[in-house]
Amino acid sequence: GKSACELSPAVRHSLADLDIQVSTGPVVDFRLREHLRDLPKDGTVPLLYPGHFAASGLTWPLAGAKKPNAIQRSGATEKWLYPRGFYCVVRRFSSKEERRRVVAGVVDPGLLADAPMLGFENHLNLFHAHRHGLPEALARGLAVFLNTTAVDEQFRRFSGHTQVNATDLKRMTYPSRENLTRLGQWAMQQGQLTQAMIDAQFGTLTA
């Protein structure tokens, strides 16, 4: 049968319709190793990996993490950085054991000190507006939508592999900006979201 996403008339917009772009995180750590720092200090900006995102939200910096938390801001790294803002991110890889393929999170700049720029590591996909952040409610609404069971089921049917690439996310259809914003505003009024809450709220969307 068809997944709820395909059946819902509320989910029929391309990212181009929404004027949102999705890209692979441009910071490939082994190529920029000399610019990476374990912890933030003067002259660095946050470097975000999938490990910084958990069900409870974004945690940065991560103490004792195996990965660096920061990248030196310089002429050599500037072109790989994005300006401070709200972004929706999706992990590129999940393990076979994980319940979900599509795992989305939100970059909340309020949790990143006063960093003017941000680095996104290559194992994340990020949704942005012409290389800038999104309105907060839109970023949060995108994450809610991408974390629905319907999206995960649709993704599993169309893609046998455990990778989620930017091209896969470009091919999907989405709710309107208005509906995504509504989902985000709803999410901002809740505490911790459960799968049941997300799926129930998604079910209320109308075209």
Regions of interest found by a model, annotated:
Residues 3-192, 196-204:
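Polybasic, glycine- and aromatic-enriched phosphate-binding surface used to engage nucleic acids
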